[in-house]
């Protein structure tokens, strides 16, 4: 049996679910299930979102099944404590602290429990079409989203700026700063002539002050998708022709799900402020 732990915001959940799909492909005769137990008492983001957004159905591992190959934690707090105190079991496949790609993940026989973020498309490239199908968004209903969708053309550019919870966080701050976005906008303009920019951010005021002078095309600030409808921003990003992303799994997926065969994606070459960390981006993406 293979069990994949799901935890985090929407982008992280999507990476973990993509691994789940890939394991199903690699081990068709084994049962593959999800461990959702840590969402109990987890108050960050919007909880487990994959079923609500994508209507996905997946086998959920029972407490007994989890205890057989790992440790069962009935809530998020106990997991935070237990992961520091309890020894790693041989059946537990923990992602490297440097997030290095591990090709053995998809070939490990027998019972395995997968705990990590798995933010590397190589973990699921072999079942790319299956992942794309799983992450098919529901149709837009809100007037503002439908109106913007009609305006998007072959030269529309999505820019995702994540500040808010990143400000003051030593792990993330200082990577996608003003200099990054200025360089990314300039670089994008060497590939295409933008017809419009769509700005997605949790700090629109900062974008208006710092980025507006460099945007030489009409700008739309997308501010209306909030709370449990926040995923609509990712959906709109994927509908734009081109993407400038942040060091965020949310905008990574917005760009990856973009099906424009001629898309230009500009991304930060560094993802975290950690030594020896590896975050391989798709080869076709432009890294700065």
Each PLM stretch: what is its role?
Residues 1-3:
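Extreme N-terminal starter segment of soluble prokaryotic enzymes
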């Amino acid at each position: 049996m293979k069990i994949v732990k799901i935890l985090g915001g929407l982008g992280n959940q999507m990476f973990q679910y993509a691994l789940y799909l890939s394991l199903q492909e690699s081990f068709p005769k084994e049962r593959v299930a999800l461990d959702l137990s840590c969402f109990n008492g987890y108050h960050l983001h919007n909880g487990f979102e994959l079923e609500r957004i994508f209507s996905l159905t997946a086998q959920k591992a029972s407490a007994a099944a989890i205890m057989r190959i790992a440790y069962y934690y009935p809530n998020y707090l106990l997991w935070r404590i237990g992961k520091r105190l309890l020894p790693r079991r041989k059946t537990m496949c923990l992602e490297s602290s440097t997030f290095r790609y591990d090709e053995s993940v998809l070939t490990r026989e027998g019972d395995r429990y997968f705990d990590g973020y798995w933010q590397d498309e190589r973990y699921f490239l072999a079942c790319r079409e299956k992942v794309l199908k799983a992450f098919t968004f529901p149709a837009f209903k809100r007037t503002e989203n439908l109106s913007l969708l009609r305006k998007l053309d072959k030269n529309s550019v999505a820019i995702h700026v994540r500040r808010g919870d990143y400000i003051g966080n030593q792990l993330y701050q200082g990577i996608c700063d003003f200099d990054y976005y200025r360089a990314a906008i300039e670089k994008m303009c060497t590939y295409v002539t933008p017809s419009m920019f769509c700005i997605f951010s949790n700090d629109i005021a900062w974008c208006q002050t710092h980025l507006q002078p460099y945007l030489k095309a009409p700008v739309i600030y997308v501010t209306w998708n909030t709370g449990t409808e926040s995923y609509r921003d990712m959906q709109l990003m994927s509908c734009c022709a081109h993407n400038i992303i942040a060091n965020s799994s949310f905008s990574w997926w917005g760009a990856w799900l973009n099906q424009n065969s001629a898309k230009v994606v500009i991304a930060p070459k560094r993802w975290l402020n950690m030594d020896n960390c590896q975050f391989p981006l798709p080869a076709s993406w432009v890294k700065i």
